């Protein structure tokens, strides 16, 4: 998989902001076929930081219902929590 297509977008929520401050972690929405090694390489190349660990969470697809009938589906996606080396920062997340 191309390194440029691994990271889809950063996740900015209350939880990820707290993790950034307390545990030196940032979160990204990543391609569903990406593995931990590809995510690590993509973050290190894109932001010029060292990654210590990558934790991955998959969100299952959900059925959209209206009045008891299935109308459609929300697609599943994959989230990666990336732990950075002590002292490294990603400038994109610093103003949040």
Swiss-Prot record:
Keyword field: Ribonucleoprotein, Ribosomal protein, RNA-binding, rRNA-binding
One Pfam family cited in the UniProt record for this chain: Ribosomal_L23
InterPro entries for this protein: Nucleotide-bd_a/b_plait_sf (IPR012677), Ribosomal_uL23-like (IPR013025), Ribosomal_uL23/eL15/eS24_sf (IPR012678)
Gene Ontology BP terms: translation
Any Gene Ontology CC annotation: ribosome
Keyword 4Fe-4S in record: no
Molecular function GO terms recorded: rRNA binding; structural constituent of ribosome
Family under the similarity heading: Belongs to the universal ribosomal protein uL23 family.
Function description: One of the early assembly proteins it binds 23S rRNA. One of the proteins that surrounds the polypeptide exit tunnel on the outside of the ribosome. Forms the main docking site for trigger factor binding to the ribosome.
UniProt subunit comment: Part of the 50S ribosomal subunit. Contacts protein L29, and trigger factor when it is bound to the ribosome.
Protein name per the record: Large ribosomal subunit protein uL23
Source organism (scientific name): Desulfovibrio desulfuricans (strain ATCC 27774 / DSM 6949 / MB)
This protein's encoding gene: rplW
């Amino acid at each position: 998989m191309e390194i440029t297509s691994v990271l889809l977008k950063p996740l900015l929520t209350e939880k990820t902001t707290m993790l950034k401050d307390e545990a030196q972690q940032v979160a990204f929405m990543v391609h569903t076929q990406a593995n931990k090694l590809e995510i690590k390489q993509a973050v290190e190349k894109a932001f010029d930081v060292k990654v210590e660990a990558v934790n991955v969470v998959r969100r299952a697809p959900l059925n959209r219902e209206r009045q008891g009938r299935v109308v459609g589906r929300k697609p599943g996606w994959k989230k990666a929590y990336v732990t950075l080396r002590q002292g490294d920062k990603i400038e994109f997340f610093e103003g949040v």
